[in-house]
Swiss-Prot record:
The keyword Transferase does not apply. InterPro entries: Ig-like_fold (IPR013783), PapD-like_sf (IPR008962), Periplasmic_pilus_chap (IPR050643), Pili_assmbl_chap_C_dom_sf (IPR036316), Pili_assmbl_chaperone_bac (IPR001829), Pili_assmbl_chaperone_C (IPR016148), Pili_assmbl_chaperone_CS (IPR018046), Pili_assmbl_chaperone_N (IPR016147). This is Probable fimbrial chaperone LpfB. Residues 1-24 form the signal peptide. GO terms for biological process: cell wall organization; chaperone-mediated protein folding. It comes from Escherichia coli O157:H7. Keywords: Chaperone, Fimbrium biogenesis, Periplasm, Signal. Disulfide bonds: none annotated. The gene is lpfB. It is found in: Periplasm. One of its GO terms (cellular component) is outer membrane-bounded periplasmic space. NCBIfam families: PRK15208.1. Its main location: periplasm. The keyword Ribonucleoprotein does not apply. Gene3D superfamilies: Immunoglobulins.
Amino acid sequence: MDRMMKSKFVALALSLFLSQSVLAGGVGLSSTRVIYDGSKKEASLTVQNKSKTEEFLIQSWVDDAAGSKKTPFIITPPLFKLDPEKNNILRIVNITPGLPQDRESVYWVNVKAIPSKSDDSENKNVLQIAVRTRIKLFYRPAGLKGDVKTAPNELRFTRNGNQLRVDNPTVFNITFNQFFANDKEIEKAGMVPAKGALNITLPAGVGSVSKIKYNTINDFGSXAEMITKNVD
């Protein structure tokens, strides 16, 4: 095995080891986003403690993009202890009428895992860190017209100076996964709101942009197929 192949093998093995350690050592969620079907009374999300030894105090809430907790949603239970290798289901309930019925609305689910103090940490200088996970909550009204699978194809792009305007005529919020202008990747392009627009700042030196290539994140948190669109 030559040196380059050996280095790649070691790097791969190390990355697999680290990823398995992370998965085995803490709290995880059953999905990377929650789709709340407006025809249902609630949506759910499973919290998983993958540690064999540690227990955690789990605190959960819903807020908006600005961080305000004044939202139409509550989570039950908002606070509970999660034992090692156990799961618990969070129930997200819409308690306030009045959300738009002609498009999706977006909020955020926050789950904070606080390690319990162990006997071994008594009288020791042990640093315990609470970890918060924040994922999108999409409220999808009942009877919403349109196809979420084809919505990314309907985006329209217009350039104005160093800004690329993305118009979304659909009723669905569309989150970019990868985004390329002249084959140059623009990281964290963001989300285009339903029936709204997003302005993306193009990096210096990108040149004249006539085509955009991108893919988006679907309801399951996976990357959809790449799409190529012209820029007006």
